[in-house]
Amino acid sequence: MRRRVCTVVRAVVCLLSTSLLTTCDFTGIFAAIQSEVPIKTPSIPGAIYGLVKAGSKLYATNGRLWEKELNGTGSWQKVSSSSVPTDSDKKVMSIATDGNTFVLACVPGTGVYKHCVNGAGSSSTGTTASPSTETCSQHATLVGGTSKPFWLVPGGTGNNGNCGCGGGGGGSSSSSSSCIHIWLVPGGTGNNGNCGCGGGGGGSSSSSSSCIHIKVENTDEQFLDMGEGYVVTTKHLYTKNGSSSAGPAQCPGGGGGGGSSGGGGSSEYTKASCSFSTPILASVSDGCYHYILTKEKVYCRKQDTASSAASSPAQCPSSPSSSSSSSTNAGCEVAHGVDDPLCLAIFKHNGCEYLLIGGSRGYGEIKLEANSSGTNGTCMRLKESNVHKSPGQWGESSPTPKASAEQYRGTVGRFAVQKIYVVEKNGGGNGVAAGGAGCPANASSSSGGTSSTQRPDLYAAVGESSDTYTGLWKFDTTTCSWNRE
């Protein structure tokens, strides 16, 4: 009798289990699976070291230089021009551009190569025996810039002359200090033709080129970024002075200190009085403000954009306090909440402006307040309530709109975002910092921008431990989804 009861109970349990399974609603799960965007096979394999827009094309490097049409839907193609190396042992580790006519490609230990966009300035045959490097670039370690390109030369590599840059030989063994030498590249310099830019002969005494020498405290201080009137290293923000008497001490072993020879000579830069927790990890400027990224915070400092003055030091709040809640620091620094931050970028569109902070798992965003200035010219753009630490806090005006947040979580949000690139479409873009609380779709810029600008393209260089998903990703505004390029 007992055995019969147990059998009946087991049968009832099985029936109930089957009933529960058949009555559960799985439509949400299946809908999510069916709506998942298929991940593309990458056009560019491997890690991405740089991406720039030049004219109507985009250029990227994974060790080789690639290109594609800016507004096209085609795939990336290797640059086959003889102006850049294709040898496997010569890897292009950084790229830069003047924005229109040429791209610079740096192979550390070899030099800087120039590729002319759309064949401008090329020979009638379009070929040469072998690519050649730009004058005086043999010691360059990287190139940078998207409108005013430059290359970086470490201190102590002045054996072949200073090429019109002024004093060289920084970083001698007799001193614990060293210099960072930044070569400013004028249009049309170098050996590979002028790409239609005019000028020529980079490094000659008749050239309009010049060098910036930054005296650093020790060899641990590394270059990060530069722009109009400022240079950022892993330890300091340096700003241009306009008066040589206020400049830094000459580079050790440097002799002339720059400015006495060559065209334009050395510009004098000094440390801004602002202090940041170090190391500084990344920086970006929108032309009005500097944004400095550290492990825990983002700092904002007002940038002097007066072209007549050589840019005075960035201004800090009076009597700065270590407490972020202090009224003197309000709006000038904020905790970003991103794990293992790696990079910083600015995204602007139709009156909205966001800071994007790449980290070990996707990126975070900070919505910037409308342009405002407090006492002493400080910025008041960073607000804790505008720090969006998770996609659930994103809005429809966000770089990745709220409706696409879940798709982001399952793709780019799972991996390290090592670099973020914001690329404006040709024919329109919001180039000035502007406010606008609601960020309506067709809002006009308060600074006189066009009323309906094209949304910039958003790219991310993703790194993943197994390399399965490592590479270049893009937010596709047509499908409103992230996918590999």
UniProtKB/Swiss-Prot annotation:
Location of this chain's protein in the cell: Cell membrane
UniProtKB keywords: Cell membrane, Lipoprotein, Membrane, Palmitate, Signal
Signal peptide location: 1-23
Record's compositionally biased regions (Low complexity): 308-327
Lipid tethering residues (S-diacylglycerol cysteine): C24
Organism per entry: Treponema pallidum (strain Nichols)
One GO CC annotation: plasma membrane
Highest taxon of source: Bacteria
Protein name (database record): Uncharacterized lipoprotein TP_0136
Residues with a covalently attached lipid (N-palmitoyl cysteine): C24
The keyword Metal-binding is annotated on this UniProt entry: no
Bilayer topology annotation: Lipid-anchor
Main location: membrane
Keyword Membrane tagged: yes
Residue ranges of the region described as Disordered: 308-331
Family: Belongs to the TP013X lipoprotein family.
Lineage summary: Bacteria, Pseudomonadati, Spirochaetota, Spirochaetia, Spirochaetales
